[in-house]
Regions:
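Conserved acidic carboxylate
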Residues: 8
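Two-component/phosphorelay signaling modules centered on CheY-like receiver
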Residues: 11-29
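C-terminal output helix
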Residues: 18, 102-115, 119
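Acidic catalytic/metal-coordinating carboxylates
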Residues: 33-36, 59-62
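Active-site residues of response regulator receiver
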Residues: 52
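Receiver (REC) domain active-site loop signature in two-component systems and cognate sites
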Residues: 55
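Alpha4 helix (beta4-alpha4-beta5 surface) of REC/receiver domains from two-component response regulators
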Residues: 62, 83-109
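Hydrophobic/aromatic residues positioned on beta-strands within the core alpha/beta folds
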Residues: 77-79
Length: 121
């Protein structure tokens, strides 16, 4: 079973993503901010990371930089309400960029695509 780390500070969205992705057959880890996400990487390696950008403690861009420096083989999907970050240089380090929606069709498609692609191979 593929393991996905969902990094999202809004509890209702984090629980929604967890429920929806578990129904798709994924094992889900969650983190409320970048610092928790980095801790999760130290204890268990997910197959993919879904990363919010605007979060307290450690934002998504700083978290992305640390992930890229430590675990480049793990694909990262930036998932945000703010489309302006798409042009941010640091966002180019992510494998995909998906605008948040309660319709997870696009997010699920990107997850399947990246997991099937087998990053780093």
């Amino acid at each position: 079973m593929k393991k996905i780390l969902v990094v999202e500070d809004e509890e209702s969205l984090r629980l929604f993503y967890e429920e929806e992705l578990k129904a798709e057959g994924y094992d889900i880890l969650t983190a409320r901010n970048g610092r928790e996400a980095i801790r999760q990487l130290e204890t268990g390696k997910p197959d993919l990371i879904i990363l919010d950008i605007v979060m307290p403690v450690m934002d998504g861009m700083e978290t992305l930089g640390r992930i890229v420096g430590q675990e480049r083989k793990i694909p990262v999907i930036l998932n945000t309400s703010y489309s302006g970050y798409r042009q941010d240089f640091m966002s180019w380090a992510a494998d995909a960029y998906v605008t948040k929606s309660h319709d997870l069709t696009e997010l699920k498609r990107k997850i399947r695509e990246l997991l099937e692609k087998g990053k780093g191979q």
